[in-house]
Design a protein with these regions (language model features):
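C-terminal segments
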Residues: 1-17, 135, 139-153, 171
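Short glycine- and Lys/Arg-enriched binding-loop motifs that mark or flank ligand-binding interfaces
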Residues: 39, 149, 174
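Conserved small-residue-rich beta-alpha loop and adjacent elements
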Residues: 154-179
């Protein structure tokens, strides 16, 4: 599968390894159905008092996972954590942020079968659409990274001031906005 690139145009004739990998991932996922998962707030797993069952539209008797029912306090904690992290992230050079995002995209690609199987069971998409969506997610991140590099971090020189006798340097700079 090394030379096969999954796209919406190629999904109609994929190599057999794509089906085999997906089938194995579905079986592994089914073995863990019903497991409880916490929320992640400020880098820590947080459990809520209330839970809910995440069921599959493929078979509504399948409980895929027991999830946390977050409340306003959890949302406030998550927003506070994001605000706390923002200054460091916004001062991280764009090249380093691109490096982190490329690593995230690579991890998504490495876990394409696991993520695709989870999407198929949770959303009810067929295997090729779910695998295609996972690959498209990685590709979108790669594209954003490419655009950042192509545009030098989106530091773009703007037009000269047209007024006679005035000299101004106008620059457009893309920066993280915050929480």
């Amino acid at each position: 599968m090394a030379d096969f690139k999954l796209t919406y145009a190629t999904m109609f004739n994929p190599p057999e390894e794509l089906h085999t990998g997906f089938d194995k991932a579905v079986e592994a996922l089914k073995k863990n159905m019903g497991k409880e998962y916490g929320m992640f707030i400020n880098g820590k797993e947080v459990l809520a008092d209330e839970k809910f069952d995440d069921t599959s539209p493929v078979n509504t008797s399948w409980v895929l996972a027991k999830m946390q029912k977050g409340n306003a306090s959890h949302a406030t904690q998550a927003i506070a954590a994001a605000r706390k992290a923002f200054p460091e992230w916004s001062h991280t050079p764009w090249q380093k942020r691109v490096e982190y995002l490329r690593k995230a995209a690579s991890l998504i690609e490495q876990r394409i079968f696991e993520l695709g199987a989870a999407m198929a069971l949770e959303v009810g998409k067929n295997r090729m659409e779910s695998l295609g969506d996972v690959q498209e997610t990685a590709d979108l991140i790669y594209y954003s990274c490419y655009q950042m590099e192509k545009n030098d971090g989106y530091v773009v020189e703007m037009g000269k001031d047209p007024l006679v006798g005035y000299e101004a340097r106008n620059v457009s700079v893309l920066r993280p906005y915050g929480v």
